[in-house]
């Protein structure tokens, strides 16, 4: 019973503290284009307030965005490629 109550308390907190990854977009709905990761790291951390960023498939991919930030809709395959790059 205690475990169940703890689960009910922790689950909403995890949802609130969650971060997301993706191509952060500006007010026009476009993600910044890039050739180098250093530019993307600055763009993602200073403009979009993400944890870090890098260039993935010629657009800036931001890691650790807040849930209220808009991201570009992309295919699952493209997301897997960019998320795999984070691990490597």
Curated annotation (Swiss-Prot):
InterPro entries in alphabetical order: LCN-type_CS_alpha_beta_dom, Scorpion_toxin-like, Scorpion_toxin-like_sf, Scorpion_toxinL/defensin
PROSITE patterns per the UniProt record, alphabetical: LCN_CSAB (PS51863)
Tissue: Expressed by the venom gland.
Superkingdom of this protein's organism: Eukaryota
Disulfide bonds: 34-55, 40-60, 44-62, 56-82
Residue ranges annotated for the LCN-type CS-alpha/beta domain, each copy included: 20-83
Pfam families xrefs: Toxin_3
Principal place of residence: secreted
Keywords noted in UniProt: Disulfide bond, Ion channel impairing toxin, Neurotoxin, Secreted, Signal, Toxin, Voltage-gated sodium channel impairing toxin
Subcellular location field: Secreted
GO molecular function: sodium channel inhibitor activity; toxin activity
UniProt GO cellular component terms: extracellular region
GO biological process, one term: defense response
Signal peptide positions (record): 1-18
Function as written in the Swiss-Prot or TrEMBL entry: Excitatory insect toxins induce a spastic paralysis. They bind voltage-independently at site-4 of sodium channels (Nav) and shift the voltage of activation toward more negative potentials thereby affecting sodium channel activation and promoting spontaneous and repetitive firing.
Domains (record comment): Has the structural arrangement of an alpha-helix connected to antiparallel beta-sheets by disulfide bonds (CS-alpha/beta).
Protein name: Beta-insect excitatory toxin LqhIT1c
Phylogenetic classification of the source organism: Eukaryota, Metazoa, Ecdysozoa, Arthropoda, Chelicerata
